[in-house]
Amino acid sequence: MDQAKLARMQASVRIGGKGTPRRKVKKVHKTSGADDKKLQATLKKMNVQPIQAIEEVNMFKEDGNVIHFAAPKEERALTVGCEIKVHASVPSNTFALYGNGEEKELTELVPGILNQLGPDSLASLRKLAESYQNMQKNQAGEKKDDDEDDIPDLVEGENFEKSVD
């Protein structure tokens, strides 16, 4: 062994009596794989069963956004890790979702999500529609003002060329 390396190792180890520090051991951090195994074991105890043919899962948040889990389309099905899995245990009222969720606004999902909306979400959808209509009115009002500025007003008895100059 290298003498310098041996000297460093001896410096960190103290052989002695009471009150001397022991050899320093590097801590090994747990990986998420161990947590996943514990979670799987707990879900197995709860008798969680897989639910087939789930196309999408939407979780509505209080701020109006939606956490959207979508089943892979046929062209994306070969990609590893983009699949959504749903497991449920009805007696224990437990549902487990596996997959990558995307946070989206309600407007991005509007056509296909209308049948999933509850009373709270319908109220937020109404507010969203009202704000969209107000934005459209404001934009139409601005366009109307722009159009009026481009076209000069003609007064009876005047010629168009005179009003342009």
Swiss-Prot record:
Keyword Nucleus: yes
Entry-linked PROSITE patterns: NAC_AB (PS51151)
Record-linked InterPro entries: BTF3, NAC_A/B_dom_sf, Nas_poly-pep-assoc_cplx_dom
Gene Ontology terms: biological process: protein transport
UniProtKB keywords: Cytoplasm, Nucleus, Protein transport, Repressor, Transcription, Transcription regulation, Transport
Main localization of the protein described in the UniProt heading: cytoplasm
Sequence ranges of Basic residues compositional bias: 20-30
Region (Disordered), start-end ranges: 1-34, 133-165
Record-linked CDD domains: NAC_BTF3 (cd22055)
Compositionally biased region (Acidic residues): 145-158
Source superkingdom: Eukaryota
Ranges where the NAC-A/B domain occurs: 33-110
GO cellular component: cytosol; nascent polypeptide-associated complex; nucleus
Keyword Cytoplasm: yes
Family: Belongs to the NAC-beta family.
Subunit details: Part of the nascent polypeptide-associated complex (NAC), consisting of egd2 and egd1. NAC associates with ribosomes via egd1.
Described purpose of this protein according to its UniProt entry: Component of the nascent polypeptide-associated complex (NAC), a dynamic component of the ribosomal exit tunnel, protecting the emerging polypeptides from interaction with other cytoplasmic proteins to ensure appropriate nascent protein targeting. The NAC complex also promotes mitochondrial protein import by enhancing productive ribosome interactions with the outer mitochondrial membrane and blocks the inappropriate interaction of ribosomes translating non-secretory nascent polypeptides with translocation sites in the membrane of the endoplasmic reticulum.
Protein name per the record: Nascent polypeptide-associated complex subunit beta
